[in-house]
Design a protein with these regions (language model features):
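Right-handed parallel beta-helix/beta-solenoid
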Residues: 9-10, 18-32, 62-95, 114-132, ...
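Beta-strand-rich solenoid/repeat architectures in extracellular/passenger domains
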Residues: 1-13, 29-57, 79-111, 130-146, ...
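Extracellular beta-solenoid/beta-roll
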Residues: 207, 217-221, 227-362, 366-367, ...
Length: 374
């Protein structure tokens, strides 16, 4: 499909573009729009594709691969199914590649890009590529409750070089449910009334992977990372993330690992009291974390990076506490704290480590007022 195209749908559960495999036919389905099939497709002036949906539960572009007998391709991301057990006998691939264009959705739970598949298990490896969507130089706007820009359920979505705006309540930049992979590269994203990335699951044994790469910027009204999944891995490289709520991580349940490299992170880290819930955060290569409020992580590694417990911004000190429930590792790390020089009851930032510490870390303490105890 080449050239300038316009696709408009007006009904509930409608689809702009669909790549689908199902049943016993082990045959791949691949749709390409203005793409030459390469990793970096070439574009021609005017070769834009515009997709607009107006209806609830609609999808702009959808790759669907055997989502289960109790689920349809356009079933909502978190619609439950007793058949969604995490295995697939059909290895056929549904793939949709779109280069250069715009996707706009209007309606409740109307996603711009949706990869809806069933994981293929190979030993201990989980493969979520049987349903995949790749968007390059595409801009996304969604209007509606829970109208996530990117949705993946045991599928893979890659977004490269574009802008994302979600305007409706609880509409995230991206959400993964019951496992999957999302990659954001050269992406500017704003979730005006939702979270940045939502990672959730209703079944055990599934993994969620998110890569935020190459100068991407994510801003959200609520937390950047909402986590309620068994196992998730998030990589942030050469990028910035922040939220209007000043919350970076909200880990309700499960094991969440976040690796930030040469990136700027703003917002607190929250974790539930569930003993099986853990947050492992690693900062490297000149990354900064401005925690903004009391924060808790399980493990923290600060490698040639900086953590601002609070900043010397001229305001009165509001004591902030960073709690590390397990271990801390420093490699030329820096921790910035503020304290009032007074008696034992003076306001001060704190770092509390319940486990072991290792490596080298410098603490930079700024006087927030006072001249010492007498």
């Amino acid at each position: 499909m080449q050239g300038k195209n316009t696709i408009v749908t007006t009904g509930d559960y409608s689809i702009g573009l669909l790549s689908q495999t199902s049943g016993n036919l082990n045959t791949d389905t691949i749709i390409r729009v203005n793409s030459d099939g390469s990793v970096t497709p070439s574009f021609s002036d005017g070769d834009d594709t515009f997709i607009v949906t107006a209806g609830n539960h609609a999808v702009g572009v959808l790759a669907c691969a055997s989502p289960g007998s109790a689920r349809a391709c356009v079933s909502s991301l978190d619609e439950e199914s007793t058949t969604d057990t995490g295995s697939n006998e059909n290895n056929a691939i549904a793939k949709l590649d779109m280069a250069k264009g715009e996707i706009t959705t209007h309606g409740t739970e109307s996603y711009a890009a949706y990869a809806n598949g069933t994981v293929v298990k190979a030993g201990d490896t989980l493969d979520y590529t049987n349903a995949s969507v790749t968007l390059t130089d595409v801009d996304i706007t969604t209007h509606g409750d829970n109208a996530h820009a990117i949705a993946a359920r045991q599928g893979t979505v890659s977004f490269n070089q574009g802008e994302i705006y979600t305007t409706g309540p609880d509409a995230a930049t991206a959400k993964i449910y019951n496992g999957g992979t999302v990659t954001l590269k050269n992406t500017s994203a704003v979730a005006h009334q939702g979270s940045g990335i939502g990672l959730e699951s209703s079944i055990n044994g599934q993994e969620a992977t998110v890569d935020i790469l190459s100068g991407s910027s994510l801003r959200s009204a609520n937390e950047i990372l909402y986590h309620k999944n068994e196992t998730s891995n998030v990589t942030i490289t050469d990028s910035e993330v922040s939220s209007a709520a000043d919350v970076f991580i909200n880990n309700i349940k499960g094991h969440l690992t976040v690796d930030a490299t040469n990136s700027k992170i703003t917002g607190s880290a929250n974790i539930s009291t569930d003993v099986n819930t853990h947050t492992y955060l690693s900062l490297s290569d000149n990354s900064t974390w401005d925690i903004k409020a009391d924060s808790t992580v399980s493990n923290l590694t600060v490698d040639n990076s900086t953590v601002y417990i609070s900043r010397a911004d001229g305001r009165d000190v509001e004591p902030t506490r960073l709690t590390i429930t397990e271990n801390y590792v420093g490699n030329n790390g820096v921790l910035h704290l503020r304290t009032e020089l007074g008696d034992d009851n003076s306001a001060t930032d704190k770092v509390v480590i319940n486990g072991n510490t290792s490596g080298t870390t410098r603490a930079k303490v700024t006087n927030a007022g006072g001249s010492g105890a007498y």
